């Protein structure tokens, strides 16, 4: 289903309600540059580095795209997805069933998720929706819940410190979205709806967040404009 949510005037802040869920795959595919490419890259990296029968959890799994990509490469992995939206989880279960993938799904707040003896934790464009005062605590709980040698994979929309450069990058991104079929009105509507809901950090702030939780090193494996994917190793 095509994303046309913001063709009409917005009446509330952005949230992952049933309407958003119904168009989510199209929305993220057209809104996040090279979403499919970066997702496949992460899956290939994890498929190479994870031990046999590794446990992987995706916090904010949405419609399970990342988990399904990983399952296609490594069917020995024990996969789990958590999302606060019951509609997202319902969609994820349907997709997993269609692919014949054995994935455990649950509805829940990622801040309250039990992370224990995991080999990998994924958060794809989810951390940016967590209020800043709670992010450090969440990343620390992820670190604590990973096995030694485990990896935390997180993709984030980022901001730049230099205001002029940041403005240029936003304009480039909005031009990109227009080429994906969104009107300038839709782009402006979504930007307004996301204000104070999606709160991005700089690249350095994201690295500091992970290192401060205890991770020994942080690598970046993908970047396009305001979008990055990090791997933090325990």
From Swiss-Prot:
Keywords: S-adenosyl-L-methionine, Transferase
Organism name: Campylobacter curvus (strain 525.92)
Residue positions binding S-adenosyl-L-methionine: 35, 60-62, 109-110, 124, 191
GO MF, one annotated term: carboxyl- or carbamoyltransferase activity
Superkingdom per UniProt: Bacteria
Function per UniProt: Catalyzes the conversion of S-adenosyl-L-methionine (SAM) to carboxy-S-adenosyl-L-methionine (Cx-SAM).
Assembly information from the UniProt record: Homodimer.
Catalytic activity: prephenate + S-adenosyl-L-methionine = carboxy-S-adenosyl-L-methionine + 3-phenylpyruvate + H2O
Protein's name in the database: Carboxy-S-adenosyl-L-methionine synthase
